[in-house]
Every structure is written in C-alpha cells, then in structure tokens.
Design a protein with these regions (language model features):
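Intrinsic low-complexity, disordered N-terminal segments enriched in polar/charged/small residues
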Residues: 7-9
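Active-site histidine-anchored catalytic micro-motif
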Residues: 64, 68-70, 119-126, 136-228, ...
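Conserved anion/nucleotide-ligand pocket segment
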Residues: 212, 221-260
C-alpha cells in the first residue's frame, strides 16, 4: 500500500495532537517568544498585501484552497450522516489579484444535516479533502474556509482536527490560513496548527468578504516574508445564545470595536503588530467541552503579543458577562402574537427561534402554526415548515384542491404532535418541491423552512409585506429580512435551538461556566 493509502487509515481522536517544529518567529527566538516590554507605542496592523512582490516571482506560489464547515446542533434528534462536496473556487481571492500565485482548488465539504456529524461520514469527508491536498503537493500555503462549530462523534471539534491533519501533510513551514464564523467553538489547541486565524466580526453576519480578504492579505504578506504570523486562542468560560451577543447591540458592539482598535493600534507594551483579532460568541447548541466564547489573535512574530491581546479582550468580555441580553425584541409565543396583532406596523416578523434552521434546528415544528390557527389569526404567513410527505400530498392533489394534512413534527417529535387540519392548496411552486397552503386565515409554505432573504419569498410568488404576521424559523433576522421588516419580535419557543439554554440537556460542556454556575470566578494571565 502506498503512503497516501496508508494515511487514510489514521484515527481522528478528540484529543489528537500533531507535533511539528513550527517556523521560528521573525526575531529567531524559540516559541513562545519572550519580549521585554520597552515601549508603550501602539503599532498598526499589516499593510495591504495586494500586488506585493513575492520572492522568486517567476515561479507562482501554489496556494491550496479548501472548505470544511458546519454549525453542529447536537440537540438535533438526527445525526448528520452524509456530506455534500464541491470543488473549491479556482480563482484568486481579490486580495491576491496582481500577485504571482496559483490557486490549487481542493474540495469544499459540508454535512447535509444539522445534527451531530457521524464518525464515519466525518472520516470519509476529511479523507476526501485531505486526498485532494496530497494530490496537490507540494504547495506553498493553505487557505481553509471553516466555521468552527462542527462536532463529530468520536472525533470532537472536527475542523480543528482537520487543520491538524493538514499541518501533518504540509509540514511546519507552509503557512495555513483559516477563516471562521464568530459562532465557532474554538479549542485553544487550534493555535498550534494554524498560523493565520481570522473570524467574522459581525452578527448578523455582514463581513464575510472582509474576513476572507483580511486572511488572504495576511497570507500573501507571509509568503512575501513581510510578516511571520503566530496565533493564540483563549477560551472564556461563558456560554450564550448568539442572539445575546449581537454587534447591533451592547455590550458586544463595543467589545468588537475594541478588537478592531487592537488590530489598528496593537497592544500596549508590545511592539509586534496585531494582524487579526476576533471575539467568538460560540455556538450554544453544540454540546462539547469547547463550547463557549473565546478570543483569537494573530500577531506578527510574537506569541507573547498575541497572548497579551487575547488576555486584554477576554478580561473585557468577562467583565461584561452580566450585561449580555437579547439584542432584539423578544417574547413568549402568545405574548409575541398578541403584540404583533396590536402593532401599528403593517407587518411584524415573528421568528420561531427554538426551531431556528440557521442554528441547525430541524425546521419542522408546527408550534407557531398551531397557535395562530387556534387563535383564528388572519393575514399570517408561516415561512415555512419542512415536511416532504405533506408536499407530496399537495402535488398529488393539485392547486385549488382541499385536503386533510398532517403537518410537521416528522423529525422533531419531542415538542408535540403534527398539526392536523383541512388545507387548501393555494399554489405549487414550479420546479421546486414547495407547496403553499391556506388553513383558515394562515398561509403556510411547506417544503422549505429556511427563509432568510426577500428573494426566497419572491421565488415562491410571495410578498411578505402583504401579511400582518410573517413567521420565519430564525433567531435574529438575517440582514436581508431585517432590511425590510417594519418590526421584528423573536419568539422564545422550544426546540433544538432553544434560546433559554438552561433548558438544554448538556452532558459535555465545560464546568464551571457562566451563567450555569453564576458565581464562576476566572482570571486571565
């Protein structure tokens, strides 16, 4: 058996450690770098890298690009047992335009379900991604698009394990850049494998392009020899639902602004530049030892500076821990419906947060639909409920027909039975397994649960602003809907994405942690 074949048989344990001598920082010292603070000068971050001259510019630098991402909800009743694959984009990032680089595309892999990733599926997906890397060798650098909250049976934090295995293939000298969602649960040991670690700074997310651009620029500067990135990850013992840490509300807005300031000005007492600073909220619906908030710093050549910046930001987050609250209007189910009906606004969006598909919940709970019908609400739209069998019944009946349907609770059965009632098939969406039905005064989109953008309504022939109430399966509204919603109320409904995380049956979370152990004390040093 060849070496590539043999390497496919390796195990992926949760405590995996890949040992490699890493590149020395630019001062030539051994890591961690020990600096003697000799100045209070605050130093700016890396200069733009686009067009930077690379050594030996006649030979393109080969950058392997791949993706491996998931926001795992371990409270989802079903495991994710399959991945979808696509070839990564082969075009240079905007930050690399004009530079002599060759993008070597690998695979992008993502689980097709929302629940805990099965061990076999994760192993297979990792091996496929790693095989494309082995085939691409030698490479000068690696660029990975990750999420940070993938959790697999028998493997644990799968994205961190993947980065470790990538390091074992490319060796200690090739820089590895990674981008993340700020809802990732980031293990401290990730910093031992990745060089350039950059996450989103906005929730709701509006800075994907900027995050990729920053990581790409730092990677190009690294290849040019103008920076030598080293990273530090510092976990913070706080678990919060993401809706309590939105960058549109305090205290998280100011905390992220401080991270931006650290990027611009550096950290007092250290001359090294801070190339990237990310505050991670974490994903509360992933039950794992790494679940929770953290700080991720990439500095130029000084692990001491990276650690100092991480400590500075972690202390500020910890001091603000009791101030975190929902960054949007919220209410219990009945109260939220009553507020919406009494609202002066022409349309009120209600988000069914417990069944939030953007937090990898099932998207098939009929709780809000049932209550709207029970209260004889008119002018409401539920967008939507995932229920393929109900859609098939509608397709067989045809538009304009009335039939008795059992809706929802096909996957998530822990929070009540399906909704049963007479439904009129209003419309069948062309070339899509989607049906729109009317039950009393409520219209329901069946077959697609994830409505996060106005374009999805348009594709179904719907104008959400023609309804008094629009129910979507989100927590906070994504930017596209937030931009059109006259008013939004987040319903505190049960489900795999329950915002009241104290009701979730954690078994693997760290202890002690705030707010579960409210008197938790911690010092960062």
């Amino acid at each position: 058996m060849n070496r590539a074949g043999a390497s496919r048989q390796q195990d992926f344990p949760e405590n995996l450690v890949v040992s490699h001598a890493r590149r020395k920082p630019q001062n030539g010292g051994q890591e961690p770098v020990k600096q003697t603070p000799n100045s209070n000068t605050l130093i700016g971050s890396a200069s733009p890298a686009a067009g930077v001259a690379l050594p030996d510019s006649h030979t393109p630098r080969r950058i392997f690009v791949a993706g491996f991402a998931h926001e795992t909800n371990t409270f989802h009743p079903l495991a994710s047992t399959a991945f979808s694959f696509a070839q990564a984009a082969d075009q240079p990032l905007p930050a690399w335009q004009g530079a002599n680089v060759l993008v070597v595309p690998g695979l992008s892999a993502q689980p097709s379900g929302g629940g805990t990733v099965s061990q076999d599926a994760c192993r297979e997906a990792m091996n496929k991604v790693l095989d494309t890397l082995r085939s691409a060798m030698p490479v000068d650098a690696v660029f990975l698009r990750l999420h940070g909250a993938m959790y697999a049976q028998g493997i644990g934090p799968a994205e961190t394990v993947l980065v470790a295995l990538v390091r074992s293939i490319v060796g200690p000298r090739a820089p590895i850049a990674c981008t993340f969602d700020l809802h990732g649960n980031i293990p401290a040991r990730l910093a031992g494998f990745g060089d350039i670690l950059v996450g989103y700074k906005t929730a709701p997310h509006t800075d994907h392009a900027q995050t990729v651009d920053l990581a790409g620029r730092i990677l190009l500067d690294t290849l040019a020899g103008s920076v030598r990135p080293v990273s530090s990850v510092l976990p913070i013992p706080i678990i919060l639902p993401g809706e309590k840490a939105m960058t549109t509300a305090e205290p998280f807005r100011s905390l992220v602004e401080e991270a931006r300031r650290v990027e611009r000005q550096g950290i007092r007492g250290h001359q090294a530049k801070i190339l990237a600073a990310t505050l991670f909220v974490g994903c509360a619906w992933t039950d794992s030892p790494d679940t929770g908030m953290s700080v991720m710093i990439t500095a130029d050549g000084s692990r001491d500076a990276a650690r100092a910046a991480a400590i500075h930001l972690a202390r500020l987050v910890w001091e603000a821990r009791r101030q975190f609250a929902f960054g949007c209007e919220s209410a219990e189910l009945d109260e939220g419906i009553s507020r919406a009906l009494a609202a002066q606004e022409s349309t009120v969006f209600l988000s069914d947060s417990g069944d939030n598909v953007t937090a990898s919940a099932t998207g098939d709970l009929p709780l809000v639909l049932r209550r709207l019908v029970e209260r004889n609400v008119a002018g409401a739209l539920v967008a939507g409920i995932g229920d393929p069998p109900a859609v098939r019944q509608c397709l067989q009946a045809g538009a304009g027909k009335t039939l008795r349907l059992s809706i929802g609770a096909g996957v998530e059965t822990r929070f009540g039975p399906p909704f049963a009632g007479e439904a009129l098939v209003v419309r069948l969406v062309e070339n899509a397994p989607i049906a729109i039905v009317r039950i009393g005064g409520v219209e329901v989109v069946l077959g697609q649960a994830g409505f996060t953008d106005p374009g999805q309504f348009k594709a179904c022939g719907l104008d959400p602003l023609k309804y008094k109430i629009v129910v979507v399966k989100e927590g906070y509204l994504f930017p596209g809907l937030a931009g059109i919603a006259p008013r939004h109320i987040m319903l505190l409904t049960p489900g795999a994405g329950d915002m009241r995380i104290e009701r979730l049956a954690y078994s693997r979370r760290r202890k002690p942690v705030f707010p579960f152990e409210p008197e938790t004390n911690v010092t960062f040093s």
